[in-house]
Amino acid sequence: MHNQAPIQRRKSTRIYVGNVPIGDGAPITVQSMTNTRTTDVEATVNQIKALERVGADIVRVSVPTMDAAEAFKLIKQQVNVPLVADIHFDYRIALKVAEYGVDCLRINPGNIGNEERIRMVVDCARDKNIPIRIGVNAGSLEKDLQEKYGEPTPQALLESAMRHVDHLDRLNFDQFKVSVKASDVFLAVESYRLLAKQIDQPLHLGITEAGGARSGAVKSAIGLGLLLSEGIGDTLRVSLAADPVEEIKVGFDILKSLRIRARGINFIACPTCSRQEFDVIGTVNALEQRLEDIITPMDVSIIGCVVNGPGEALVSTLGVTGGNKKSGLYEDGVRKDRLDNDDMIAQLESRIRAKASQLDEARRIDVLQVEK
């Protein structure tokens, strides 16, 4: 396995969303948001459970009405992952979901009413130990900031965020995280850089409205990758016009690529050329689908020939190097066996699952020894 990247993370305070720590060196969490009608309890619960299965640490649910708040109560009872309620304009909805056990409130203090209503929500959050996320978005900047700056700028997003932060500071509430999202990569990145210098609270990263599954993943990888490589960010959401499950997968892929947080298999595969001795592309695509259930961190290299194959295999948990009719299988950098090219997928799946079980057992024993 490769060593972890030497990224020096920004120091921040810590909050808890349910039992999930955010900030102060805690693992960077990956979250998504449901896109069902919240009042359709069954559909929303099913989607949340699908997100749980692929590793979502936190799930956000839009709660636009009191009917949705009542549905939220039923949803919360049926899932295990911490839930964030996304609320705008009506402070009473925030108070209601707080009664029902919400794990975090996503609000902007400035758009839920006058100072007294803000105080009521914040006091409720304090009493019930519920953190708040301030969510600034370039597409919904306050009118006076639009007039002042002419268009969304990093300074405009920062000023908007600091207004909301000041609201909470005046009420002596510090259990919050902040996001300053934009669909433009450079706008979002610079906004987060400015904000990171101004506050100590955890930062929720995202490129909002990034696009479809492919283009949105690319934008998010660039924007979030830049920030994460600079040590900025404590939790993230990849926003895609796609199945929310894909947001979680891409989020973990970004963290794996930067070696910040490992979950599941990190496939290393060549783009193929005429030297390939077996169907690399078909093998990788099939294994990615078949092995989605494995959460054990592993590097698996699948290289079609001997040009780069042995070198990649040396630093992989398992590695395959293409050969004539049979390909070399490496384990922890040591050549162990040869696999039939015609039955590569099934053989390699079996070896990967066996290795994952071996690693899991070794970790279990290590934990038991530490506990003793």
Swiss-Prot record:
Domain of life assignment: Bacteria
Cofactor info, note text: Binds 1 [4Fe-4S] cluster.
Entry's Gene Ontology molecular function annotations: 4 iron, 4 sulfur cluster binding; 4-hydroxy-3-methylbut-2-en-1-yl diphosphate synthase activity (ferredoxin); 4-hydroxy-3-methylbut-2-enyl-diphosphate synthase activity (flavodoxin); iron ion binding
Keywords linked to the UniProt accession: 4Fe-4S, Iron, Iron-sulfur, Isoprene biosynthesis, Metal-binding, Oxidoreductase
Pathway: Isoprenoid biosynthesis; isopentenyl diphosphate biosynthesis via DXP pathway; isopentenyl diphosphate from 1-deoxy-D-xylulose 5-phosphate: step 5/6
Family: Belongs to the IspG family.
Protein name (Swiss-Prot/TrEMBL): 4-hydroxy-3-methylbut-2-en-1-yl diphosphate synthase (flavodoxin)
Cofactor(s) essential for the protein: [4Fe-4S] cluster
Residues at which [4Fe-4S] cluster binds: 270, 273, 305, 312
One BP annotation, GO: terpenoid biosynthetic process
Catalytic activity: (2E)-4-hydroxy-3-methylbut-2-enyl diphosphate + oxidized [flavodoxin] + H2O + 2 H(+) = 2-C-methyl-D-erythritol 2,4-cyclic diphosphate + reduced [flavodoxin]
Alphabetized HAMAP family for the sequence: IspG
Pfam families listed in its UniProt record: GcpE
Keyword flag Iron-sulfur: yes
Source species of the chain: Salmonella schwarzengrund (strain CVM19633)
